[in-house]
Amino acid sequence: MRKVAVVIGSQTDLPQCKEGLTLLQNAVESGQIQLYLDSVFISSIHRATDDTLNQLADISKSEDVDILITGAGWANHLTGVCDAYLRYGLDDVRTRVIGVAFEDKDDQTHTQAAVASIVNVPGTQVIYQDDGGIFIGADGFTRACQFAISDELPAIKLPEARPQVRMSLADAIAKGG
């Protein structure tokens, strides 16, 4: 049975999650999936960084979470950090990450930034769309939940990690052109 975890960046995003969370609840009740710790985690990568990373470590250590649904608005760093930390920090090549960009109806530049922060990450393994398009807003979250319940999960293909490079200030200036 597939096991799903959910991490949302803010409680203010929950109204966009209601239909999708209801879909997950129905799937749990019908025995289609299990929800990790029977919980939805609300955790800001900016304001609760350690808590978020510790939760990801717990999810990874459980060794039975197949898919992590992440959702956040504005710049949505949550999704990319979850994917990068699982892959390169925890060496987790089992848990797939679905990213949802939540809408800001008052300022579409926030919505656009949330989308760009998911789809424009080089080497990302984040699942951010289905046949209906990119996972954006309430409809996108619902479709992401449906994908987590019933779609075939893609294999994770990691690009080669890039080691940190340390150089002198003079060398950095020289390499800068």
Predicted regions located by residue number:
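Amphipathic, non-transmembrane alpha-helical secondary structure
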Residues: 18, 53-57, 142
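Glycine- and other small-residue-rich loops at beta-strand/loop junctions that grip anionic moieties
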Residues: 41-45, 71-72, 100-102, 129-130
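Short glycine/serine/threonine-rich phosphate/pyrophosphate-binding segments
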Residues: 13-18, 49-52, 74-82, 107-111
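Glycine-rich phosphate/diphosphate-binding loop of Rossmann-like nucleotide-binding domains
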Residues: 1-46
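Glycine-rich phosphate-binding loop
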Residues: 52-101
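Glycine-rich oxoanion-binding loops at beta->alpha junctions
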Residues: 37-62, 107-115
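C-terminal binding/interaction regions
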Residues: 11, 15, 90-92, 96-177
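Short, solvent-exposed amphipathic alpha-helical segments in soluble enzyme
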Residues: 20-26, 56-57, 84-87, 115-117
